[in-house]
Amino acid sequence: MTDPRKGDHAEPTTHFGYQDVPESQKAKKVAEVFHSVAAKYDLMNDVLSGGMHRLWKRFTIELSGVRSGNRVLDIAGGTGDLAAKFSRLVGPTGQVVLADINESMLKVGRDRLLDRGVAGNIEFVQADAEKLPFPDNHFDCVTIAFGLRNVTHKDEAIRSMLRVLKPGGRLLVLEFSKPTNKLMSKAYDAYSFAFMPLAGKLITNDSESYRYLAESIRMHPDQETLKAMMVEAGFDRVTYHNMTSGIVAVHRGIKP
């Protein structure tokens, strides 16, 4: 029944972690989280994953099939881990676009890669995954690592990624997922809701952002659901690979 105080046009809500918030507010709240943690994002990734995030990303790159001369889009590219590696793979005849909706994360990534001297074939673009500002059929490969769970309309973002890919192009989605056994799931819950906020407090003086991280992982679609979303968007040959007992999964789809 419609609440008469809200009228017939109440704004739809979505989840921000375990909270329900108006859709128009989620992007702002996510931006605040990443603005808070941007400076120490890489350090926290190493601490929270025990360095495993580097192996997960390496496997994703291996699955991508990126080679010299390719054009690659790395969405939610943050501090540039994937972009730096793709830059070497595509070489001087290729191009990497590092896109992120968050200005603070984009600045950290740009400064980091410029300092390392690997930004010659990398373009930095502030962009919304749901409305990618690129031409149709433009990229050989699109990646998004640990970013899709923060997107308000995931289905729209996946369709946008399909649009900008060339026929035969690959989408790789690396994201936290659902552990494949109960024992690991219980241990992971204890770790996520106790250690992660504590580490956030000690290292970044921000426990709430890492509590959101734990909650956002639980609200993200599981492996089969995300696979179905990619198929529904129009991708062919969609597969996924579980890593670390399903704590993380990488999905791959091909544009027909």
From Swiss-Prot:
SUPFAM superfamilies, alphabetized: S-adenosyl-L-methionine-dependent methyltransferases
User: Which Gene Ontology terms describe the biological processes this protein takes part in?
Assistant: aerobic respiration; menaquinone biosynthetic process; methylation
| Keywords, sorted A to Z | Menaquinone biosynthesis, Methyltransferase, S-adenosyl-L-methionine, Transferase, Ubiquinone biosynthesis
Keyword S-adenosyl-L-methionine appears in the UniProt entry: yes
**Biased composition regions of type Basic and acidic residues, renumbered to the chain:** 1-12
Q: Which Pfam families match?
A: Ubie_methyltran (PF01209)
User: Which superkingdom is the protein from?
Assistant: Bacteria
Answer whether the UniProt record assigns the keyword S-adenosyl-L-methionine to this protein: yes
Q: Top-level EC class, please?
A: transferase
Sites binding S-adenosyl-L-methionine sit at: T79, D100, D128, A129
Per the UniProt entry, the Enzyme Commission number(s) are: 2.1.1.163, 2.1.1.201
**Family to which this protein belongs:** Belongs to the class I-like SAM-binding methyltransferase superfamily. MenG/UbiE family.
Q: What does this protein do?
A: Methyltransferase required for the conversion of demethylmenaquinol (DMKH2) to menaquinol (MKH2) and the conversion of 2-polyprenyl-6-methoxy-1,4-benzoquinol (DDMQH2) to 2-polyprenyl-3-methyl-6-methoxy-1,4-benzoquinol (DMQH2).
HAMAP family linked = MenG_UbiE_methyltr
What name does this protein carry? Ubiquinone/menaquinone biosynthesis C-methyltransferase UbiE
Lineage at the top is: Bacteria, Pseudomonadati, Pseudomonadota, Gammaproteobacteria, Pseudomonadales
